[in-house]
A protein has these predicted regions:
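Thiamine diphosphate
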Residues: 31, 38-52, 353, 358-522
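A short, well-structured juxtamembrane/interface segment
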Residues: 143-158, 177, 321-336
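Glycine-rich phosphate/diphosphate-binding loops that line cofactor/substrate pockets in enzymes
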Residues: 1, 87-98, 150-164, 183, ...
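Active-site diphosphate/adenylate-binding microenvironment
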Residues: 304-391
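Glycine-rich, acidic loop regions that bind phosphate or pyrophosphate groups
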Residues: 32-86, 194-306, 437, 496
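A short, small-residue-rich loop immediately preceding and capping a beta-strand
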Residues: 1-35, 227-236, 391-405, 420-425
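Glycine-rich, anion-gripping cofactor-binding loops and their flanking helix/strand elements
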Residues: 152, 167-257, 265, 362-392, ...
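Glycine/aspartate-rich loop-and-adjacent alpha/beta segment that forms the canonical ThDP
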Residues: 52, 98-101, 105-144, 482-522
Length: 522
């Protein structure tokens, strides 16, 4: 994706997206206009220092030369090459360089209007590029294959493990998710799948039901006395669940191996014993083949995870039929969404509710989120962009603050005829902070963390011509959500669900306690 802006503070508005692209490995081309060199540091209006302004958050930054009226062929070729190099750098110029943003800063002198320039050479064959619509400079890269010695050592470690497990964090590759579910099946080992892993919602779920584990955020809170794993295979980014992170921290005796295509470090707890830089899907496929040649028997270890998973969802399903709360909103949305739909899940509480309350299901739902830096900037706009690259419908579930920060994203939907379903869980402020110890300290909590705003969003929807529904009960929400999905081909709908953060937290804690007590007896 390429984004363009004028000079000055407009360039700073791109920074949150650039940071997210940096940490999430998303290719992005940043094209900023700038004042000419003689006006920099001169007090000229709308002029700031834009040269390498994004620091290490971009893969490459170039202050492009001023345009010339009659450029030499060398200059033309350098610009054509620059475009190709920028595209390649954003997409990972080699397979060990993470994808991310590239910044090209273009200074211009007046006149800026599209007027004829004497002796302009835009019709020169040098501008035309290569024949057959090929890039001027084609840059290719291949996958990193693991060495034979690394795979032999991995096979040996895996073969001698008695209690192996797979962790798949946020991941955009459906191929990797499929390879790991196959490995978990033939290896009879639990696959703890993050809600953004692409492994929870798959058409293969029923045949993998006993291995794909999604209820861990609840039942691992009662697993302190469980036997620890002796091998943990870690794929993708760090998981969303704090309970799973705590479990990894407590697994002192486990040999932990992380896998990465580009060497990006995803271990804030500094626990991994080994990092293998290679194509993770190829490694998973090789391990599955190795296992199928020497099948593992089912074990008490894997059976306990499977039994805990089943019991957890029995308890959660029953709890969803009780008093309405915010976790039920996310669970019901996922259960109603059709096969092939896409979900963009907002940060803060929504992604955690998806993790804890939306059970795995036998349908392909691609889950997106901004988990690189986990900010709430540009939530509506990002979902709008994602919707243009996936099959309809796309559902956005966000909190009220995330929606409030990007309400003008609704204008993008209106202007470009983009139709999505937006669910806003409105707990009147930063409800996630209710989970933290600071919630016990008032007035600092209420004034500085909760930041109650007292707003509802029906008038916002009306201003932008978006259909609106308010849901105060589970029946109302399910009905409104089904109507919105059926109408997504013609217009967008905003569904607002008011909730009470204190009551929501009490419901969550009660459900977790029920799960903990139930799995203790397994």
């Amino acid at each position: 994706v390429a984004v363009v802006c004028s000079s000055g503070t407009a360039t700073a508005n791109f920074y949150p997206a650039i940071i997210e692209a940096h940490y999430a490995g998303v290719p992005l081309l940043i094209l900023t206009a700038d004042r000419p060199p003689e006006l920099r540091d001169s007090g000229a209006n709308q002029t700031v220092d834009q040269v390498k302004m994004y620091g290490k958050h971009v893969r490459w930054a170039v202050d492009v030369a001023l345009p010339e009226g009659n450029p030499a062929n060398l200059t033309i070729r350098s610009l054509r090459t620059l475009a190709c190099r920028a595209y390649a750098a954003a997409n990972g110029m080699n397979s060990t360089q993470p994808k991310g943003a590239v910044h090209l800063n273009f200074p211009f002198r007046k006149p800026l209007e599209p007027i004829p320039v004497p002796d302009d050479k835009t019709s020169d064959p040098a501008w035309a590029g290569r024949s057959y619509n090929q890039p001027f400079t084609k840059i290719s890269s291949g996958r990193v294959h693991p060495s034979d010695s690394a795979m032999e050592a991995l096979f040996d470690t895996y073969a001698h493990s008695a209690r192996p497990m797979i962790i798949l964090g946020p991941n955009r590759s459906r191929a990797l998710a499929d390879e790991l579910t196959t490995l978990a099946k033939v290896g009879h080992m639990p696959l703890l799948a993050d809600p953004l892993s692409q492994a929870r919602y798959t058409v293969h779920w029923q045949e993998m039901e006993s291995e794909i584990i999604g209820g861990y955020d609840s039942f691992l809170r009662g697993a302190a006395e469980w036997e620890q794993p002796d091998l943990i295979l870690r794929f993708g980014a760090m998981p969303t669940s704090q309970a799973l992170i705590d479990y990894l921290n407590a697994s002192h005796d486990a040999y932990q191996i992380a896998f990465s295509t580009d060497g990006t470090w995803k271990d804030p707890n500094h626990q991994i014993d080994e990092l293998i830089i290679a194509d993770p899907a190829e490694i998973a496929r090789s391990l599955a083949q190795f296992t199928s040649e020497d099948p593992r028997p089912e074990s008490v270890w894997s059976d306990r995870f499977s039994a805990s998973e089943s019991r957890t969802w029995e308890i959660i399903d029953a709890a969803l039929n009780e008093d309405f709360f915010d976790g039920a909103v996310v669970a019901d949305a996922v259960s109603i969404m059709p096969d092939g739909a896409s979900l963009f899940i907002g940060n803060s509480l929504p992604v955690r509710h998806l993790d804890q309350f939306a059970r795995p299901a036998p349908k392909a739902i691609h889950v997106f989120g901004s988990r690189g830096a986990s900010g709430i900037d540009g939530t509506v706009s990002t979902a709008a962009g994602v919707s243009q690259g996936v099959s309809a419908p796309l559902v956005l579930i966000t909190g009220d603050l995330g929606f409030y920060h990007d309400m003008n994203g609704l204008l993008t939907l209106k202007r470009h005829g983009i139709h999505i379903v937006i669910v806003v869980i409105n707990n009147d402020g930063g409800g996630i902070f209710q989970r933290l110890p600071i919630a016990q300290f008032d007035p600092p909590y209420t004034e500085l963390f909760r930041t109650s705003h007292g707003m509802t969003f029906g008038h916002v929807a009306a201003q932008y011509g978006t259909d609106y529904a308010k849901a105060d009960s589970r029946i109302e929400f399910r009905s409104a959500f089904e109507r919105a999905l059926s109408a997504v081909g013609s217009h967008s709908t905003l569904i607002e669900v008011p909730t009470d953060p204190i009551q929501d937290l009490q419901r969550r804690n009660d459900i977790v306690q029920r799960v903990i007590e139930a799995v203790r007896t397994l």
